């Protein structure tokens, strides 16, 4: 009869029996966990892009439903060579809320919808001119989604925008990267937003903000920022382009649109443009020059005359000649204007652009685009409180005087 092993060791190797059993248990748990992880992943659909449009086929005038488009990455399950890879697809459902749309999508797919990889929240052109901010509230509660998800509007419908991408990857990811790269580091002034920035704007009840507008266009359109979109038969190659921005007032009220050039002038007008470029065309020679903006400050005076507000805007701009373009200042000839002539040309250019921007603010964008509503509230609180309800009408009739002084540095560079 074999004697029991009082040491609790396994065989002649002296390994404790408990250690062997522990290793076997860990291996078993690892195998089970691995199988469970794969099963869990294969049971999910990852949302990369979330688009919202006004309902395409309303059943009545009061139809309060929306078309929700989900751009999905779906793990391929099974035992094929493609198992574990991602399949990309777009799914559109019509519901009254994002939560209801998600529930319907999960039933249709037989998978759990996951938003941890969400890159882009996109609103179609028609819906972007209505009240849509409430449709983002579901995502504000998700911290990881808030910080990584870009928010934008698009030309046409969000559904068609997502459908324009190739089958091999998600255009939502391309668009999110393009939106972030377009403005660049240090220029995040509310033009390109992620969901977190939008949440802060709405929480602070900011008077004015912008959302970038994207479009899929032929490759000969200016300001394209990303390539690689497949072309249909007989069509030109298409590109992802940033074509401007939609402007909104407090609580998401639509105010109008700004093209790319107007946005740059707006940056300069409100003192947010540093390191940017200004393009001018010499009236005499027709040549083009570019100047780098160093600093822009605006002194504002305001008052009321016969019940109508007035504003005096005095900009002081300092810039340097760039190595881009045809002309710099120099000898004072028609070919090489003097520094004073060039400064005058720049002042005329800036005055014309600031005047156009101010007139557009009075027609449609509102005073907040230039910060004039807050300024009036601060400097003339009693008058503003008494006239707040008719502020928009009064501002549209306001007298606005513009003055620009430009200082050109660079030591007389001539080319």
Predicted regions and their residues:
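N-terminal secretory signal peptides that target proteins for export/translocation
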Residues: 1-14
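Membrane-proximal alpha-helical signals and transmembrane carboxylates
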Residues: 11-22, 26, 30-415
């Amino acid at each position: 009869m074999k004697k029991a092993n009082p040491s609790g060791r396994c065989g002649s190797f002296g390994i404790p029996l408990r250690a062997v059993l522990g290793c076997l248990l860990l291996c078993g748990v690892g195998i089970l966990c691995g199988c469970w992880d794969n099963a869990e992943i294969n049971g999910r659909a990852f949302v990369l892009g979330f688009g919202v449009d006004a309902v395409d086929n309303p059943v009545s005038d009061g139809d309060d439903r929306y078309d929700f488009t989900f751009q999905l990455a779906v793990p391929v399950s099974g035992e094929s060579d493609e198992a574990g890879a991602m399949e990309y697809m777009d799914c559109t459902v019509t519901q009254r809320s994002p939560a209801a749309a998600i529930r319907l999508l999960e039933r249709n797919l037989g998978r759990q919808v996951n938003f941890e990889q969400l890159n882009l929240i996109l609103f179609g052109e028609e819906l972007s001119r209505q009240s849509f901010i409430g449709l983002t509230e579901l995502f504000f509660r998700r911290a990881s989604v808030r910080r990584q998800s870009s928010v934008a509007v698009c030309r046409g419908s969000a559904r068609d925008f997502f459908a324009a991408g190739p089958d091999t990857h998600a255009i939502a990811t391309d668009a999110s990267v393009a939106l972030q790269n377009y403005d660049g580091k240090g220029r995040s002034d509310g033009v390109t937003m992620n969901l977190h920035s939008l949440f802060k704007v709405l929480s602070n009840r900011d008077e004015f903000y912008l959302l970038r507008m994207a479009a899929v266009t032929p490759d000969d359109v200016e300001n394209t920022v990303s390539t690689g979109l497949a072309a249909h038969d007989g069509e030109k190659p298409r590109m992802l382009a940033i074509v401007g921005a939609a402007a909104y007032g407090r609580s998401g009220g639509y105010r109008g649109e700004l093209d790319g050039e107007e946005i740059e002038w707006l940056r300069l007008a409100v003192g947010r443009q540093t390191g940017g470029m200004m393009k001018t065309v010499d009236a005499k020679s027709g040549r083009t020059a570019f100047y780098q903006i160093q600093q822009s400050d605006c002194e504002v005076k305001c008052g009321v005359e016969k019940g109508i507000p007035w504003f005096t805007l005095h900009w002081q701009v300092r810039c340097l000649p760039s190595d881009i373009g045809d002309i710099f200042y120099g000898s004072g000839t028609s070919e090489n204007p003097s520094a004073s002539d060039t400064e005058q040309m720049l002042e005329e250019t800036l005055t014309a652009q600031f005047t156009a921007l101010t007139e557009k603010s009075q027609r449609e964008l509102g005073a907040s685009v230039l910060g004039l509503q807050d300024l009036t509230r601060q400097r003339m609180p009693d008058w503003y409180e008494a006239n707040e309800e008719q502020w928009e009408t009064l501002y549209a009739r306001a007298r606005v005087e513009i003055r620009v002084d430009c200082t050109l540095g660079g030591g007389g560079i001539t080319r």
